[in-house]
């Protein structure tokens, strides 16, 4: 069984909805177990992360980067880095913000660099760019490095972030789970 862990921070609930979509996508791949871990619980669940075949990172984009709580957690993984505990695990990332750009690429790049520091194997979005104006197409924000979603500056809900962005996240989760399963053999 392939094990996928999703570590995320959500300040207002939007990124949690996206994390749940990513988890649904990963769980849709037969023989996959998924652990959804809020970043506040990640240190306590380090054994779950160490046992995972893949770790997917999720954070809102705040001021052009990962959120403070997510960065704080990243910095707590120094001992894991030193021992290369996550070497050759699959990695991927997703982010959400209130604007179409919002410098989300920088957030994904920060996650990618973090994964590279841990000698992980990054999996891209793997979906051709959709039409940004069409709120129903996959990958409407044209991200190649991971899932990008946009939320209205309103309460998080079943439609905020959009269904298309949630479906894009689900596709990322399924892609990561498929790679983890292949890697596991």
Question: For each predicted feature, which ranges?
Answer:
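Short glycine/proline-rich, acidic loop/turn segments that cap or connect secondary-structure elements
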Residues: 135-152
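Short, glycine-/small-residue-rich phosphate/pyrophosphate-handling segment
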Residues: 90-140
């Amino acid at each position: 069984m392939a094990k996928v862990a999703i570590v995320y921070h959500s300040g207002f609930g939007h990124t949690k909805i996206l994390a749940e979509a990513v988890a649904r996508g990963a769980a849709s791949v037969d023989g996959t177990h998924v652990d959804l871990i809020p970043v506040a619980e990640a240190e306590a669940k380090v054994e779950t992360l160490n046992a995972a075949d893949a770790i997917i990172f999720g954070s809102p984009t705040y001021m052009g980067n990962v959120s403070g709580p997510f960065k704080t957690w990243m910095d707590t993984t120094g001992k894991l880095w030193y021992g290369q505990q996550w070497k050759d695990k699959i990695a991927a990332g997703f982010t959400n913000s209130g604007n179409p750009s919002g410098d989300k690429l920088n957030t994904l790049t920060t996650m990618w660099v973090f994964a590279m520091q841990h000698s992980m194997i990054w999996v891209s979005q793997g979906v051709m760019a959709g039409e940004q104006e069409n709120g129903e197409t996959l990958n409407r924000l044209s991200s190649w490095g991971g899932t990008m979603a946009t939320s209205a500056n309103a309460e998080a809900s079943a439609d905020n972030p959009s269904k298309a962005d949630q479906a894009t996240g689900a596709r990322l989760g399924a892609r990561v789970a498929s790679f983890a399963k292949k890697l596991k053999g």
